Swiss-Prot record:
Active site: 65, 138
Keyword flag Iron: yes
Gene Ontology terms for molecular function: catalase activity; heme binding; metal ion binding
PANTHER family in the record: CATALASE, CATALASE ISOZYME 2
Protein name per its UniProtKB record: Catalase isozyme 2
Main location: other
Localization terms from the record: Peroxisome
Species whose genome carries this gene: Solanum lycopersicum (Tomato)
Keywords from the named record: Heme, Hydrogen peroxide, Iron, Metal-binding, Oxidoreductase, Peroxidase, Peroxisome
Top-rank EC class of the record's enzyme: oxidoreductase
Binding site for heme: 348
Biological processes, Gene Ontology terms: hydrogen peroxide catabolic process; response to hydrogen peroxide
Keyword Glycosyltransferase: no
């Protein structure tokens, strides 16, 4: 055994306690003092090391999606889509790929209850033979905003007041009163499904539009969806209060206990596809993340199944150090020009480097399971042992070569540099259609939640009026009911 390559594989591989450097500890109960009652000596390195390590146990919390739970499993292809993509993990029915999935709430802190009204993260990391693929989505198929320039401000508005650290409706509704594209997302968040019963009983969505590329180089727009085989279940407010009051980690425990009992959660992945040549045929922009694609025109097509059959065995390594980035794709899957997706391509990898360090992809949960090779060396917390002499490319002493060329989208882009909004905003049609699809009692609960939110005493008459105007444009009767209950007229 090479002692320079040896690393402990377990905390229990020594019969006695040791320091971090391996020295035996004969007393892990008492500090080193001058006499039985004298002062503690600074030279007690074991004490100093123990306290210093304890002081640094917690790593930086995620800015969003801090509260989460993870599980391992597999993705299996059940339907052939090789005509759409050259992605190796989608090459044929029956192919299985190991995955790790992280579910989360979005806005609230790491220890917050899992019964708060909040979107839920649904992120899947595929460990494919051609590298990792991160599909970083939510349980809702749309988002609040369509341009990443607004993302920091949006998160600030949703987070607690920086003065009082209290999350307040007036801040949220003030910000989004400037962004009517958020209405569609609010028809999900303020709906009954705004509080999922647990992680097993909720949908998943890739949210953004991605691109599939086949071996011939043909590109197809795609949206990814996950449907739970056990159905979607949610909590109404009264039950959410009871459940959260009894156990603030109820969804994490439900996921863990279900897998431990052999009741493996399963989802049916499906896709919607669209040829780029058809994107101008709709009354909305298909790359607008605040919109859904109509399923009657672009139906869901089954792809496979996702099964979670193994619990994680270390929360820090497999949940807190688990890092997802929409930029991590594989041959056959690519991005689109969705403005929010383009922003997340940079932002997510950047926040992981801040939170976990520049070598976060060496951590066990994030490292690819396939062979990999590059000349990315050193840096903070680099723990990969390498003994090569060649750390540059190309070299006649190193036989590594370029991989076989694989197709990427060949879209021709032209236009002038400008900062502008998209042409087809169409902010009110889909929110109105979704509201009208609710049953009368579901509509009533939706209205009641909005009345409560708009009744915040710090919300001005102007802001209430703007929101009623927005909802009136989505559905006239909805706007009238809100105006009547709040005694406010629309602003137009």
């Amino acid at each position: 055994m090479d002692p320079y390559k040896y690393r402990p594989s377990s905390a229990f591989n020594s019969p006695f306690c040791t320091t971090n450097s391996g020295a035996p500890v004969f007393n892990n109960n008492s500090s080193l003092t001058v006499g039985a009652r004298g002062p503690v000596l600074l030279e007690d390195y074991h004490l100093v090391e123990k306290l210093a390590n304890f002081d640094r146990e917690r790593i930086a919390e995620r800015v969003v999606h801090a509260r989460g739970a993870s599980a391992k499993g597999f993705f299996e292809v059940t339907h052939d889509i090789a005509h759409l993509t050259c992605a190796d993990f989608l090459r044929a029915p029956g192919v299985q790929t190991p995955v790790i999935v992280r579910f989360s709430t979005v806005i609230h802190e790491r220890g917050s209850p899992e019964t708060l009204r909040d979107p839920r993260g649904f992120a899947v990391k595929f460990y494919t033979r051609e590298g990792n693929f991160d599909l970083v989505g939510n349980n809702f198929p749309v988002f609040f905003i369509r341009d990443g320039m607004k993302f920091p401000d949006m998160v600030h508005a949703l987070k607690p007041n920086p003065k009082s650290h209290i999350q307040e409706n007036w801040r949220v509704l003030d910000f989004f009163s400037h962004h009517p594209e958020s209405l569609h997302m609010f028809t999900f968040l303020f709906d009954d499904i705004g509080i999922p019963q647990d992680y097993r009983h909720m949908d998943g969505s890739g949210v953004h539009t991605f691109t599939l590329i086949n071996r011939a180089g043909k590109s197809t727009y795609v949206k990814f969806h996950w449907k739970p085989t056990c159905g979607v279940k949610s909590l109404l407010e009264e039950k959410a209060i009871r459940v959260g009051g009894a156990n603030h980690s109820h969804a994490t425990q439900d996921l863990y206990d279900s897998i431990a009992a052999g009741n493996y959660p399963e989802w049916k992945p499906s896709i919607q596809i669209m040829g780029p040549e058809h994107e101008d045929k709709f009354d909305f922009d298909p790359l607008d993340v605040t919109k859904t694609w109509p399923e009657d025109i672009l139906p869901l097509q089954p792809v496979g199944r996702l099964v979670l059959n193994k619990n994680i065995d270390n929360f820090l390594y497999m949940n807190e150090q688990l890092a997802f980035c929409p930029s991590i794709v594989v041959p056959g899957v690519y991005y689109s020009d969705d403005k929010m997706l383009q922003t997340r391509i940079f932002s997510y990898s950047d926040t992981q480097r801040y939170r976990l360090g520049p070598n976060y992809l060496q951590l066990p949960a994030n490292a690819p399971k396939c062979a990999h090779h590059n000349n990315h060396y050193d840096g903070s917390m680099n723990f990969m042992h390498r003994d090569e002499e060649i750390d540059y490319f190309p070299s006649r002493y190193d036989q590594v070569r370029h991989a076989e060329v694989y197709p990427i989208p060949s879209t021709v882009c032209s236009g002038k540099r400008e900062k502008c909004i998209i042409q087809k905003e169409n902010n009110f049609k889909q929110p109105g259609e979704r509201y009208r699809s609710f049953t009368p009692d579901r509509q009533e609960r939706f209205i009641r939640r909005w009345v409560e939110a708009l009744s915040d005493p710090r919300i001005t008459y102007e802001i209430r009026s703007i929101w009623i105007t927005y909802w009136s444009q989505a559905d006239k009767s909805l706007g009238q009911k809100l105006a009547s209950r709040l005694n406010v007229r629309p602003s137009i």
